[in-house]
Curated annotation (Swiss-Prot):
UniProt membrane topology term: Multi-pass membrane protein
Species annotation: Helicobacter pylori (strain G27)
NCBIfam families: ATP_synt_6_or_A, PRK05815.2-3
Pfam families recorded: ATP-synt_A
Task of the protein: Key component of the proton channel; it plays a direct role in the translocation of protons across the membrane.
Encoding gene, per UniProt annotation: atpB
Molecular functions (GO terms): proton-transporting ATP synthase activity, rotational mechanism
Organism phylogeny: Bacteria, Pseudomonadati, Campylobacterota, Epsilonproteobacteria, Campylobacterales
CDD domains for the chain: ATP-synt_Fo_a_6 (cd00310)
GO CC aspect terms: plasma membrane; proton-transporting ATP synthase complex
Chief localization: membrane
Cell compartment(s), UniProt: Cell inner membrane
Protein name: ATP synthase subunit a
Family annotation (PROSITE patterns): ATPASE_A
Length: 226
């Protein structure tokens, strides 16, 4: 049996799936409450949480428009932005002693990767049409199509693995690093490791968001749109 560090979820159950689900829901609730607090009393001159959220949204759109264009960046922001924020909150909650990052579970990061995978294919088919979309998989040279098509299929499926394992591996490694530091010194002392994990959490959320936009751009932008 896999040994797990005690968390607040263990007060209710020691089941692995329950613990992961518990922190998935808890993270979603915390994210919703914080977001609600940021948007509850909107002001013309943003202050506090509203200012933070507007800065985050502006930063995401500023980066995304260079990848997919401003119009599509805004169109797909509800997906990419929500995933970025959720991954960020999921990463951050694991820094708190007694809590566990949902993104430290591969089953959860796999779900996120599958959401992105199916959505960008859905959008590609919707925008370009079924046959035109998959025709791109064959490449521009017809006689190479029998070789290129299966390679492209494998390449797209490998994105599920790379997206899910990249996030899972980094956050799991961060959690193990934090655990070792807390065993060596009191929790109030290792400020530097906490800061490293904080910035790593931001970085992983940023990377996941960027890749979401990159995959969407590859699916919906035609050759003329590049």
């Amino acid at each position: 049996m896999e040994h797990r560090v005690f968390t607040i979820a263990n007060f209710f159950s020691s089941n692995h799936d329950f613990i992961t689900g518990f922190f998935v829901v808890l993270t979603a609730v915390l994210m919703f409450l914080i977001s609600l607090g940021a948007s509850r009393k909107m002001q013309m001159v943003p202050m506090g949480l509203q200012n933070v959220y507007e800065s985050i949204i502006s930063a995401i759109l500023s980066v995304a428009k260079d990848i997919i264009g401003e119009e599509l960046a805004r169109k797909y922001f509800p997906l990419a932005g929500t995933i970025a924020l959720y991954v960020f909150f999921s990463n951050m909650i694991g820094i708190i002693p007694g809590f566990e990052s949902p993104t430290a579970s591969w089953s959860f990061t796999l779900v996120l990767a599958l959401i992105v995978f199916f959505y960008y294919h859905f959008e590609g088919i919707r925008v370009q049409g079924f046959f035109k979309y998959f025709a791109h998989f064959a490449g521009p040279v017809k006689w190479l199509a029998p070789f290129m098509f299966p390679i492209e299929i494998i390449s797209h499926f490998s994105r599920i693995v790379s997206l899910s394992f990249r996030l899972f591996g980094n956050i799991k490694g961060d959690d193990m690093f934090l655990l070792i530091m807390l065993l060596l010194v009191p929790w109030a002392v290792p400020v530097a490791p906490f800061m490293v994990l904080f910035f790593m959490g931001i970085l992983q959320a940023f990377v996941f968001m960027i890749l979401t936009y990159v995959y969407l751009a590859g699916a919906v932008l035609t050759d003329e749109g590049h």
